Curated annotation (Swiss-Prot):
Sequence segments annotated as region (Disordered): 301-365
Pfam family, one: Pkinase
Alphabetic keyword roster: ATP-binding, DNA damage, DNA repair, Kinase, Nucleotide-binding, Nucleus, Serine/threonine-protein kinase, Transferase
SUPFAM superfamilies to which the protein is assigned, alphabetical: Protein kinase-like (PK-like)
Residues of the Protein kinase domain: 11-279
Similarity field: Belongs to the protein kinase superfamily. CK1 Ser/Thr protein kinase family. Casein kinase I subfamily.
Cellular location(s): Nucleus
Source organism of this protein record: Schizosaccharomyces pombe (strain 972 / ATCC 24843) (Fission yeast)
The keyword Ribosomal protein belongs to this UniProt entry's keyword annotation: no
Composition skew (Polar residues), residue ranges: 343-365
One GO biological process term: positive regulation of double-strand break repair
Protein name per its UniProtKB record: Casein kinase I homolog hhp1
């Protein structure tokens, strides 16, 4: 990628920071203001171009909480380009940062926002169809506690936005999305509807609690055979077994989503209340203190203590008051490798939770 490529005569392309279902994502800079943005590029020679469609979906969803704002779309040289808000790390990156386990409090804090994001997308007559940790990114700066949903390359309208006429029930459909989090009906080839996005979210929440899902790492010679094995394991694992060791609300959630009929409107408020009531019974405080926030704070405090000790060692005759915490960003690279070999991510993490800068990531494909 040429580093001097300009997008819309206003944005300079930088290094690659991630990949979506269709196209790669680069760090960009507004050459006038210096503001950093994310730029998604797709070759104009792509066999099945999707970026313009994704841009149209973003436009329809524009203004929703946790929906990134698109600043520019057009063709530049041999690329379709979309310029949008720069966001922080994905939930998959943060999961790795937290040693691949989230506390119950963090899972419940996330569940509340994630259900709301899906509800908003559905209210605009769209399905996401690829609900997974990689497609949820935290904000930066003042919006650092807000979960954002991205990657609408596989999104699909499930009803007419005026008449609300639902798409027809169909079978023999190919699997769309990510097999690990796909609903059972999606595996069975049934047309996706609202229930499927929510079932996928259920698997994401259980994944965060458990650290992995029973159908991860299954061996097969072809992709089709692997999908079949995942489906068989998913069907044969009762929700009570899948959620064993965790509050029954997770099993109740999954059983509810699986009980919905094709064109049913889910009761999003009921699902949120399910987890909010559990949150209250656990006497948690709604303070946005996620696991990664606490870990960064611990790292920051340790670093501050080390700096203080170094100062005292260097000047034993004069004991000075500890320096004020600086606002610089200290990036720390860590490589994480998920068992099964499908993730190998370098995640530069900001140790200062109050930092206003972006956290650049290389997201898994």
């Amino acid at each position: 990628m040429a580093l001097d490529l300009r997008i819309g005569n206003k944005y300079r392309i930088g290094r690659k920071i991630g990949s979506g279902s269709f196209g790669d994502i680069y760090l960009g800079t507004n050459v006038v203001s210096g503001e950093e943005v994310a730029i998604k590029l797709e070759s104009t020679r792509a066999k099945h171009p999707q970026l313009e469609y994704e841009y149209r979906v973003y436009r329809i969803l524009s203004g929703g909480v946790g929906i990134p704002f698109v600043r520019w779309f057009g063709v530049e040289c041999d690329y379709n380009a979309m310029v949008m808000d720069l966001l922080g790390p994905s939930l998959e990156d943060l999961f790795n940062f937290c040693n691949r386990k989230f506390s119950l409090k963090t899972v419940l804090l996330l569940a509340d926002q994630l259900i709301s994001r899906i509800e908003f997308i559905h209210s605009k007559s769209f399905l996401h169809r690829d609900i997974k940790p990689d497609n949820f990114l935290m904000g930066i700066g003042k919006r650092g506690n807000q979960v954002n949903i991205i990657d609408f390359g596989l999104a699909k309208k499930y009803r007419d936005h005026k008449t609300h006429l639902h798409i027809p029930y169909r079978e023999n459909k190919n699997l769309t999305g990510t097999a690990r989090y796909a609903s059972i009906n999606t595996h069975l080839g049934i047309e996706q509807s609202r229930r499927d996005d929510l079932e996928s979210l259920g698997y994401v929440l259980v994944y965060f609690c458990r650290g992995s899902l029973p159908w991860q790492g299954l061996k097969a010679t072809t992709k089709k055979q692997k999908y079949e094995k995942i489906m068989e394991k998913k069907i044969s694992t009762p929700t009570e077994v899948l959620c064993r060791g965790f509050p029954q609300e997770f099993s109740i959630y999954l059983n509810y989503t699986r009980s919905l009929r094709f064109d049913d409107k889910p009761d999003y408020a009921y699902l949120r209340k399910l987890f909010r009531d559990l949150f209250c019974r656990q006497s948690y405080e709604f303070d946005y203190m996620f696991d990664w926030t606490l870990k960064r704070k611990t790292q920051q405090d340790q670093q501050h203590q080390q700096q203080l000790q170094q100062q005292l060692s260097a000047t034993p005759q004069a004991i000075n008051p500890p320096p004020e915490r600086s606002s610089f960003r200290n990036y720390q690279k860590q490589n994480f490798d998920e068992k099964g070999g499908d993730i190998n991510t370098t995640v530069p993490v900001i140790n200062d939770p109050s930092a206003t800068g972006a956290q650049y990531i290389n997201r898994p494909n």
